[in-house]
Amino acid sequence: MFLINSKTVNEINTKMFYGWIIVLIGGLGIFSSGAGQSHTFSAFLPIITKELNISSTSISTAYMIATLVAAFLLPRMGKFVDKFGPRIVLITTIILLGFGCLLFGAASNFFMLALGFGFLRFFGQGSLMLCSSNIVTQWFDKKRGFALGLMGLGFAISMGLHPPISNYLIEVYGWRMAWVIIGFSTWIIMLPPLIFLAVNKPEDVNMLPDGAEKITNEKNTKSKIIGLNLSEALKEKCFYILAFSFFSISMLVTALHFFQVTILNEYFNLSSQIATTLFIP
């Protein structure tokens, strides 16, 4: 059930394809995933290490475990998306991500820190990116790559804004209040468009992907499916080679981003302000 009705969507669609509004919502989702991304945590690592008296090794271990657990739970989230649709799952994810920010800001020991990492990695870096991509792909077929490319700009903007803004919030309000602000801003940015504008797929409002006209010829409506299904893909060696490649790249980039501010502080004697601005693409 959607708060926006088919009539309103079609009125907007006469001026521009409604799928581009979905791309904007998806881009906001990718941007908001910054609350659970390594480039944001990097700004907080030096102050958390100092205030909680927890070593960088212990924090990175907790972060690694939280990331791996979140990754292995993502297929379950994918099933929820298939069952309930991306919109309701996105709304739930955003609500829980906001509470994850509040939980992380209240961390006073290693256990709470690890739990906060788990919340933020699963609902931010994992689920939010998954659902945002899913809802965009529902609205596009021939222009899917272009639409996903536009949506991906949200991540670049997040890399450019979240670290320096986080550093500013830490300096002005302290790291705990910074997480409260991030949590509430995530709700403010994402909940209104998801509640009032998001639609799972074009068929829900009597439309087709890419804004295509309806085809009455039954022969032409049959789409040709090319590729492998899940069970077939899992039997191919190339699947595991590609999966390992993406896994390795993600782990390397995560490690570098997570420690970037700390490394630049300690080994290059750069201030946190400069270190966080270096994330700007």
Located regions from the model:
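C-terminal ends and interior cores of transmembrane alpha-helices
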Residues: 95-108
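Hydrophobic core of transmembrane alpha-helices in multi-pass small-molecule transporters
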Residues: 31, 100, 111-127, 247
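Central cavity-lining transmembrane alpha-helices of secondary-active solute carriers
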Residues: 61-79, 280-281
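Helix-breaking motifs and short loop linkers at transmembrane-helix boundaries and internal kinks
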Residues: 53, 85, 106-111, 141, ...
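Intracellular juxtamembrane helix-capping segments at the cytosolic ends
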Residues: 48, 126-140, 148
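Extracytoplasmic gate region of multi-pass secondary transporters
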Residues: 37-46, 229-281
